[in-house]
């Protein structure tokens, strides 16, 4: 078959990598580079050249089995990483606030005042209680129950909720704290359990040596697919068992036997002027939220106490309407084993940008937002796969991570290959 793939992130690239062995595959990417969230930036840091990831950064072999196999196939070199977590509401004030990190007893009580805070001790006690419930308790909660309601029902304190669990979830999914309260509790708990976030013995995290772009290069080199960058798909029309793909607002199109939409749900919907009611419902129920991302060296956007600095740093702040602002600073030195002589941070949604003279780059990444409607849409996704020779994939079909994007594409590859096999047998009989 002649197959069009729209989007060159993990889902589109993986689908092309697998399907190009038996099909003629063309990948359309609107940007000038391939990789999607696999975005490595070259930084000139006082004359030192450093490659830094700004999107996909880490994985582990337990929860990313497909990606692990792919890296083995491509002979991708990786290094051990770190996934420590810190909380700070003191980073931008002269005194007070709260800071702690889970690295050790010393970092938990790096702010010595925590030793004398009953609410802090209560939070630590409730972390243990939460882990016990998650690991051994009854998780038969209604799939529609929100995390906020679940925490209230189990009588967890505001300190535990606001200084630990909600910030961690907000950091993981790049989601506002308020939205985390609406996150389905059952899905949240299952994610924590599957990723062993409730265990002492956690999986070893790894990062791609030289940056995530290195695996993208190797994947593209090992496929016969035709990758077209700077080729923005502006419309897709499906008729007469064929698919017409329009590029760069030109009134010309290429014709294919099938199309794989490996883009964000809202992007896919914008291309389809003939989406049926089911496609419209499923794709519109999985929404995206834009995030502002800065690559910089401004220490003001890290916890005040350097002892607390962790791989992931949740910075708690509020806007003028008293709404909580989700700001996360990734300490890239710890995540990518970069010499600490060159402090580098990737910060999402800071209340104020880092100093311009300390900034290496600004980017915008959209992340899927998960609620009851989103998970319901995922469960119905198979009902539209293959209809009118169209398939849909992306990290949005899982929990929003690299492995989810790969597995989503793998399901489509399996579906297309099985249909192709059945058709071959039918034609031969």
Give the predicted meaning of each segment.
Residues 232-366:
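Mid-domain catalytic core of redox enzymes
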Residues 20-44:
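Glycine-rich FAD pyrophosphate-binding loop
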Residues 11, 33, 266:
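Conserved Rossmann-like nucleotide-cofactor binding loop
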Residues 61-182:
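Mobile amphipathic helical/loop "lid" adjacent to a hydrophobic cofactor/ligand pocket
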Residues 41-67:
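N-terminal glycine-rich dinucleotide-binding loop that anchors FAD/FMN and/or NAD(P) in oxidoreductases
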Residues 188-246:
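Helical element adjacent to the flavin cofactor pocket in flavoenzyme catalytic cores
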Residues 42, 103, 322-429:
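Conserved flavin/dinucleotide-binding core of flavoenzymes
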Residues 2-27:
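N-terminal Rossmann-like FAD-binding beta1-loop-alpha1 element of flavoenzymes
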């Amino acid at each position: 078959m002649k197959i069009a793939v729209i989007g060159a992130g993990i889902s589109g690239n993986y689908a092309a990598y697998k399907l190009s062995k038996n099909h003629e595959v063309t990948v359309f990417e609107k940007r000038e580079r391939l990789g999607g969230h696999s975005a490595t930036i070259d930084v000139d840091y006082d004359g030192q050249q450093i490659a830094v990831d700004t999107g996909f950064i880490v994985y582990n072999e337990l929860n990313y089995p497909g990606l692990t196999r792919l890296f083995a196939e491509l002979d991708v070199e990786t290094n051990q990483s770190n996934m420590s977590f810190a909380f700070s509401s003191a980073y931008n004030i002269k005194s007070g606030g709260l800071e702690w990190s889970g690295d050790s007893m010393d970092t938990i009580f790096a702010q010595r005042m925590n030793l004398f805070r009953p609410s802090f001790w209560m939070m630590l006690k409730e972390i243990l209680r939460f882990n016990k419930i998650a690991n051994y308790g009854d998780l038969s909660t209604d799939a529609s129950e929100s995390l906020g309601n679940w925490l209230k029902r189990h009588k967890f304190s505001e300190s535990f909720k606001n200084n630990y669990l909600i910030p961690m979830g907000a950091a993981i999914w790049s989601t506002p704290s308020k939205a985390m309260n609406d996150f389905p509790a059952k899905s949240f708990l299952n994610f924590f359990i599957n990723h062993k976030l409730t265990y002492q013995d956690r999986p070893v995290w790894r990062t791609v040596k030289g940056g995530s772009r290195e695996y993208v290069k190797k994947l593209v080199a090992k496929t016969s697919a035709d990758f077209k960058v700077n080729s923005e798909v502006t419309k897709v029309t499906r008729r007469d068992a064929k698919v017409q793909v329009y590029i760069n607002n030109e009134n010309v199109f290429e014709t294919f036997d099938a199309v794989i939409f490996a883009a964000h749900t809202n992007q896919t919907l914008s291309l389809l002027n003939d989406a049926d009611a089911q496609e419209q419902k499923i794709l519109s129920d999985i929404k995206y939220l834009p995030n502002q991302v800065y690559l910089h060296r401004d220490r003001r956007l890290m916890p005040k106490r350097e002892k607390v600095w962790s791989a992931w740093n949740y910075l708690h702040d509020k806007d003028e309407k008293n709404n909580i602002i989700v700001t996360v600073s990734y300490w890239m030195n710890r995540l990518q084993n970069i010499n600490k002589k060159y402090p580098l941070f990737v910060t999402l949604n800071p209340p104020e940008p880092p100093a311009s003279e300390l900034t290496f780059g600004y980017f915008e990444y959209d992340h899927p937002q998960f609620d009851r409607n989103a998970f319901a849409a995922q469960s119905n996704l198979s009902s539209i796969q293959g209809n009118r020779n169209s398939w849909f994939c992306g990290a949005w079909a899982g929990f929003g991570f690299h492995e989810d994007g790969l597995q989503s594409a793998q399901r489509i590859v399996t579906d297309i290959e099985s249909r192709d096999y059945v058709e071959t047998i039918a034609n031969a009989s």
